[in-house]
């Protein structure tokens, strides 16, 4: 049995196909925080939207395979395989993530954990200039 928050998470990831940062940021609480393996956390709608805009502008063909999804209270855990295309090359990233929700059903915190060095290798192989990437 899935919770309503699990369905919200599935809808959020499905909406990455829109490549619309405004659609995606609408899932977040105004004071939300999003952190990933390779960069400082983005805080609030403005910073989160900026990162979303960069990511959807940089990649395409977003697909998210849920290996495991579960919830406890206001927290949803995901074990995923994230797939997307950069410079015509497929990227495949195993991810473990936690999404915390506020009382109104908006994402309050999103933390994704993955092997940054494995993704970085894929990005370099696709021709992405990674100079300065470790400064994030």
Task: Tell where the protein language model's regions lie, with residue ranges.
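A solvent-exposed, acidic/Ser-Thr-rich amphipathic alpha-helical stretch
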Residues: 21-74
